[in-house]
Amino acid sequence: MSRRDNLIWIDLEMTGLDPDSDRIIEMAVVVTTSNLELVAEGPVIAVHQPDSVLALMDDWNRNTHGASGLTGRVKGSTIGEADAEKQILDFLAQHVDAGCSPMCGNSIGQDRRFLARYMKDLEKFFHYRNLDVSTLKELARRWRPEVAAGIKKKGSHQALEDIRESVEELRYYREHFLRLTD
């Protein structure tokens, strides 16, 4: 299969949901074939943010990222947003042609908003389309609730694990909802 057909999966963890006031604190990428077979797992990066940014997190983010250890990793990281973006772009250039892959993941529109604000070159590396697994989740919940009930997610809110779950979830929907097999 051509690298032009490979899919880029991305997940960001942020200090909140508003790209005007919140920041990216973790990111990971995975590349799969169009048949959802793993090509490569990219870097998982805790993006340094100053204490002044971390102090603005709401209780949910403070508790979630604190319990996972992410807040500590962010404080100890020496990788800023520009370096994180460069590392991800360097990795992606090895596996996917620029402008070819949709942005893949769960509720990926939110990730795209943060990339457009803080990592413009990375956002531009993607095709303008999104492959959002949450669309199938919402359709299954409404049209085939028994299919939707078959998904059990950990919801770890750790970028790489969330991507792995998203790929698995799409495989599940392909088989049980779309009824497509390899």
From Swiss-Prot:
Q: What is an example of a GO molecular function annotated in this UniProt entry?
A: 3'-5'-RNA exonuclease activity
Task: Please tell me whether the keyword Hydrolase is annotated for this protein.
Answer: yes
Biological function: 3'-to-5' exoribonuclease specific for small oligoribonucleotides.
GO terms for biological process? DNA metabolic process
Does Cytoplasm count among this protein's keywords?
Answer: yes
How is this protein annotated for GO cellular component? cytoplasm
Q: Where, subcellularly, is it found?
A: Cytoplasm
Grouped into one coarse class, the protein's main location is: cytoplasm
Task: State the family it belongs to.
Answer: Belongs to the oligoribonuclease family.
E.C. number(s) listed in UniProt? 3.1.15.-
Which protein are we looking at? Oligoribonuclease
The domain of life for this entry's organism is Bacteria
> What InterPro entries does UniProt report for this protein, alphabetically?
Exonuclease_RNaseT/DNA_pol3 (IPR013520), Oligoribonuclease (IPR022894), RNaseH-like_sf (IPR012337), RNaseH_sf (IPR036397)
* UniProt keywords, alphabetically: Cytoplasm, Exonuclease, Hydrolase, Nuclease
Name the active site residues.
128
Domain Exonuclease, chain residue ranges per copy:
7-170
